[in-house]
């Protein structure tokens, strides 16, 4: 009997070739092939995301989501989405057998179904209109405008991630890397197929390298029948509770209420719910400066057309190495030598002489009793800015993590991320979980095929 990998090579293309309409029993060859792809190449051991692509295509074309015999356009859309997914992960899949088998299979299926390479793609998991009375939005709002509803017929739930920016500024990425950055000027926090977030950081003190966020721009892109393009902009001393056009929702489309702005505290705290992409954004003004926090599904985080062009997507890849500050070393040296002696030799921003280290520690302990990275960031900010409002910035950043982070075991971080130059440049992408709902039907098949 052939080993599983050799059998996969033999059956890979043959299985795909049998998927044409009216292919009869030979069409069944596709499903064992896909089963092999899912069971033979564990996602956790490779940066290649082909299993995610396979699972999404399985989910879109099997069970209650399977296109009917006359739904060739829908099937072609699913294939184009599959092809797009493989292109996004191509850089990390060179030499991966499952990846190359999938690429060849997509070409075969598109040829058999006369699918054009150009055309619409299906959104993640083909969705249907919700039952009457089941929508939390307007009664005529389509289900595609409520991200979590698309999981009702699957056993899996979305895997959410968090990114936050606060203080001087400190960045917590979608992969829980924690960095302190200079990043003066305008920088992109998020740049994917659904929205863009850009921050502008300005010096806190004249001539100092210490910066903080003074402006934030969020662009929600036009999305099907859900929302029109909307722009939100906040600046120092101006935290509006509406988009720049004065509206508070997604416009005039059926699913407009799937995008909403809510003012929690006037001039201090705004929350934006984008239910059509399962995303929650929190913007605060603390003192003169802004903080940002977001909760977003991995699927949306990774919806990027060209990975190679995303080198400055800070929430995903972190700050460039030459923009990072080792604030833990600053904190350790300050504790041992005193902030005044450190100021002359430290590459970090100059510390105001009027703010003693002991006072910074005492003020941060009042709000942040756990000596984690948020506490250390607080001490760093007080030493480098002399502004006590940065204590609240760190406190609220941690409160936002508690509300938005899906893993309650990762609320507190204790070790700063020290990127190697190669890793910082490459910016390893987030590794999404396989779609469990698509894998469940395969569990019974694995003893047969693996």
UniProtKB/Swiss-Prot annotation:
Highest taxon, organism lineage: Eukaryota
UniProt-listed Gene3D superfamilies: Mog1/PsbP, alpha/beta/alpha sandwich
Gene Ontology terms for molecular function: coreceptor activity; transferrin receptor binding
Signal peptide feature range: 1-47
Sites of GPI-anchor amidated alanine lipidation: 424
InterPro entries attached to this UniProt entry: RGM (IPR040287), RGM_C (IPR009496), RGM_N (IPR010536)
Matches recorded under Pfam families: RGM_C, RGM_N
One Gene Ontology biological process: negative regulation of axon regeneration
Glycosylation site positions: 114, 159, 389
Disulfide bonds: 145-226, 163-315
Polar residues composition bias: residue spans: 113-125
Residue numbers marked as site, Cleavage: 168-169
Compartment(s) where it occurs, according to its Swiss-Prot or TrEMBL record: Cell membrane
Keywords from the named record: Autocatalytic cleavage, Cell membrane, Disulfide bond, Glycoprotein, GPI-anchor, Lipoprotein, Membrane, Signal
Post-translational modification summary for this protein: Autocatalytically cleaved at low pH; the two chains remain linked via two disulfide bonds.
Stretches for region Disordered: 113-140
Propeptide: 48-168, 425-450
CC per GO annotation: cell surface; endoplasmic reticulum; plasma membrane; side of membrane
Topology term for the membrane: Lipid-anchor; GPI-anchor
Function per UniProt: Member of the repulsive guidance molecule (RGM) family that performs several functions in the developing and adult nervous system. Regulates cephalic neural tube closure, inhibits neurite outgrowth and cortical neuron branching, and the formation of mature synapses. Binding to its receptor NEO1/neogenin induces activation of RHOA-ROCK1/Rho-kinase signaling pathway through UNC5B-ARHGEF12/LARG-PTK2/FAK1 cascade, leading to collapse of the neuronal growth cone and neurite outgrowth inhibition.
Family indicated by similarity: Belongs to the repulsive guidance molecule (RGM) family.
Assembly and oligomerization: Interacts with NEO1, BMP2 and BMP4.
Protein name: Repulsive guidance molecule A
Naturally occurring in which organism (per UniProt): Homo sapiens
Gene field: RGMA
